């Protein structure tokens, strides 16, 4: 599945002829399932960097697109857009015009991302102003309390997430009542007036658990935090208008921790969290600097107190339950939250699905040569929009359909016009 997906991502070749200033490409997006799909992401890796792009549908209507510089070299090498809907067994066709010059076109933002330092001169939790794009810390340095909302946060109008900047690297979640972008206003911490006005809030306590799909080590039969790294970098590398991408680099990680390792045994692990407009799931891509087949890892979901469990025994796991989203000492102004959590790991990478314990629904994963893609998702019972999910059965039905969607992505084909 991973190989098939990567082929679809890298299908756009020879994007710019050396003698031309512009080039047109035909892109077909084909749904091979017998059900309709919505918010279908299309991500194309460009062979040559470009300055601007224009995407038109089959009716000649311009649709929003996004150019990204994901490797930080100052050049746009990735193009993405989102197809609103594709019928069962149907295809949609687009014309992509790429130009060496110009700037990316402006569109109404459908996603948002932020990362910031805590400004101790500002007491309000939703008016912080020390925005940054990236931060690197050395081994043994923990910036968790220096960063507002403890790491980068990102959202679309359905869901919001944040990644903790410490050895846990947990994905935590923010549930919404309505479909709207909110983090610029609430900064993950809505005040009482914002709550009264219908803004969302943190809906999950994660502690040292996996939260929603954190990837960690596995050694000596136990989950291990990403404790021993030469350096750790978290960056917001794409901010919209259609997708956000958060990049996490654990450089020189000792995968044998708490045992020691040689310098040669250390490995770099780079993780990308990608959230597209119109979707409640997040795509997680993990890359290693060398063959990692011998390394075992762990991931999973927090065991929400009293939750019901779902598993297909082949990499898909979920739970639905209700608990306080914060510790007891911080519970004033909060209510118990009901959430559904889901994770989908390629079955080929699952070494074992462990029984639930008091903290987690865990997996041991591995058999990864250089890369692995998995997906995480959630729903909040607070959702009042039509796509809202409000029961364990409805959420588990969604998980089964979601797995088909992510494991059988639309086929993307490209040709020179």
Stretch-by-stretch model annotation:
Residues 1-5:
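Positively charged n-region of N-terminal signal peptides that target proteins for export
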Residues 10-19:
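Hydrophobic h-region of N-terminal signal peptides that target proteins for export
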Residues 21-126, 131-133, 137-142, 149:
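Alpha-mannosidase-like glycoside hydrolase catalytic domains involved in N-glycan trimming
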Residues 54-80, 258-264, 305-324, 344-350:
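Solvent-exposed beta-strand/loop surfaces of large extracellular or lumenal domains
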Residues 69-86, 341-417:
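Beta-strand-rich recognition/accessory modules
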Residues 95, 100-227:
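Solvent-exposed N-terminal domain segments of exported/luminal and surface proteins
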Residues 194-277:
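Extended, loop-rich substrate-binding clefts of extracytoplasmic carbohydrate-active enzymes
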Residues 269-275, 280-313:
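Acidic (Asp/Glu-rich), glycine- and aromatic
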């Amino acid at each position: 599945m991973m190989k098939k997906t990567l082929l679809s991502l890298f299908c756009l070749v020879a994007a710019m002829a050396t003698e031309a200033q512009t080039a047109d490409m035909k892109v077909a997006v084909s749904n091979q399932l017998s059900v309709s799909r919505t918010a279908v992401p299309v991500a194309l890796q460009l062979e040559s960097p470009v300055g601007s792009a224009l995407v038109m549908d089959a009716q000649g209507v311009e649709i929003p697109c996004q150019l990204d510089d994901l490797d930080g070299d100052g050049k746009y090498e990735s193009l993405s857009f989102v197809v609103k809907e594709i019928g069962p067994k149907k295809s949609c066709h687009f014309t992509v015009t790429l130009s060496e010059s110009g700037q990316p076109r402006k569109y109404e933002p459908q996603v948002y991302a932020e990362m910031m330092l805590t400004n101790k001169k500002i007491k309000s939790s939703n008016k912080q102003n020390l925005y940054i794009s990236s931060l690197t810390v050395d081994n043994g340095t923990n910036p968790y309390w220096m960063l507002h909302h403890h790491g980068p946060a990102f959202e679309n109008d359905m869901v919001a997430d944040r990644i903790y900047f410490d050895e846990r690297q947990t994905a935590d979640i923010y549930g919404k009542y309505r479909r709207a972008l909110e983090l610029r206003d609430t900064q993950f911490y809505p005040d009482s007036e914002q709550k009264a006005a219908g803004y969302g809030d943190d809906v999950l306590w994660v502690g040292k658990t996996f939260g929603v799909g954190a990837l960690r080590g596995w050694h000596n039969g136990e989950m291990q935090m990403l404790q021993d790294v030469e350096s750790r970098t978290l960056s917001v590398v794409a901010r919209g208008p259609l997708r956000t991408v958060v990049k996490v680099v654990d450089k020189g990680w000792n995968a044998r921790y708490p045992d020691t390792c040689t310098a040669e045994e250390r490995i770099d692990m780079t993780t990308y969290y990608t959230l597209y407009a119109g979707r409640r799931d997040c795509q997680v891509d993990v890359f290693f600097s060398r063959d990692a087949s011998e390394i075992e890892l762990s991931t999973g979901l927090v065991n929400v107190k009293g939750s019901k469990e779902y598993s297909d025994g082949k990499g898909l796991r979920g739970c639905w339950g209700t608990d306080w989203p914060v510790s007891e000492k911080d519970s004033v102004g909060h209510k118990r939250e009901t959430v559904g959590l889901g994770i989908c790991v390629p079955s080929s990478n699952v070494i074992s699905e462990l029984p639930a314990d008091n903290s987690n629904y865990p997996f041991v994963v591995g058999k990864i040569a250089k890369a692995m893609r998995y997906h995480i998702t959630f729903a909040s019972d607070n959702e009042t929009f039509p796509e809202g999910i409000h029961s364990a059965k409805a959420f588990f039905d969604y998980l089964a359909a979601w797995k088909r969607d992510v494991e059988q992505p639309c086929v993307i084909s490209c040709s020179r016009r």
